[in-house]
Amino acid sequence: MAAPKGKLWVQAQLGLPPLLLLTMALAGGSGTAAAEAFDSVLGDTASCHRACQLTYPLHTYPKEEELYACQRGCRLFSICQFVDDGLDLNRTKLECESACTEAYSQPDEQYACHLGCQDQLPFAELRQEQLMSLMPRMHLLFPLTLVRSFWSDMMDSAQSFITSSWTFYLQADDGKIVIFQSKPEIQYAPQLEQEPTNLRESSLSKMSYLQMRNSQAHRNYLEEEESDGFLRCLSLNSGWILTTTLVLSVMVLLWICCAAVATAVEQYVPPEKLSIYGDLEFMNEQKLSRYPAPSLVIVRSQTEEHEEAGPLPTKVNLAHSEI
């Protein structure tokens, strides 16, 4: 038949390895035994094959060529999807239909092969969705948990360097100062031991006395525990208090430095310029010339041509005059 030959040519056009081509050719002639080895790689086509068997039953279609063409269409779709890495299933369907057109010359076989490509499409979409759901995804709260774990590790490492200790300074008779340093010891109050009493042998007065003593001791224990609770909490959580104080101090110092460096625009005072530059700017604003052009004024008077000058004043001898 011409169908296996056409199928080999289509698979060669898809660029598959020679071993895979040989296996597919054997699968076309000897059944589905050899093709089952590639189901994990090419995808399962059993559902598509069952759809082809329901579409082309042997009691209705006595010829097996159309059934085989439909099943080969399912296989061609899987091969095209494997070659294209399953990026676009619509493109894979078009390639499968073109391969069916080139592989089969009879219109009935071509239609059956196209039907196999169409039947394999929903199963391929379902398998792709299942693969996408199996991919690991980052949760939205993962950055917060990562920051929290990093902060807790940093606080634990910082707390390990901080040690609390008690220091006592004593002055001896000879004037020397003796220093005692030790770690604080945690003392737990002893638990109250209940005395075993026999209800048959003990009297009512003894029971009331024991209950009164136990209640009074329990009350004294609670009062001591409340008075020492705050100091004990400070001694146990001194590392956290010091760490928090250190972090807050660093943040306050950074804020003070940033506030001192950054000055607001409206609070910025420009430096005072020299007076000569101020006068120059004033002249430029008033559009005055720096050196005005000198002006020469000439005054002319009209005199008569024949006018003579008057007589000179008489000379007076100052020695003969009386003042």
UniProtKB/Swiss-Prot annotation:
Subcellular location per the Swiss-Prot or TrEMBL entry: Late endosome membrane; Lysosome membrane; Cell membrane; Golgi apparatus membrane
InterPro entries xref list: Uncharacterised_TMEM59
Topology feature Extracellular, residues: 36-238
Lipid bilayer topology: Single-pass type I membrane protein
Coiled-coil regions listed: none
Function: Acts as a regulator of autophagy in response to S.aureus infection by promoting activation of LC3 (MAP1LC3A, MAP1LC3B or MAP1LC3C). Acts by interacting with ATG16L1, leading to promote a functional complex between LC3 and ATG16L1 and promoting LC3 lipidation and subsequent activation of autophagy. Modulates the O-glycosylation and complex N-glycosylation steps occurring during the Golgi maturation of several proteins such as APP, BACE1, SEAP or PRNP. Inhibits APP transport to the cell surface and further shedding.
Identification of the protein by name: Transmembrane protein 59
Annotated organism of origin: Mus musculus
Organism lineage: Eukaryota, Metazoa, Chordata, Craniata, Vertebrata
Gene of this entry: Tmem59
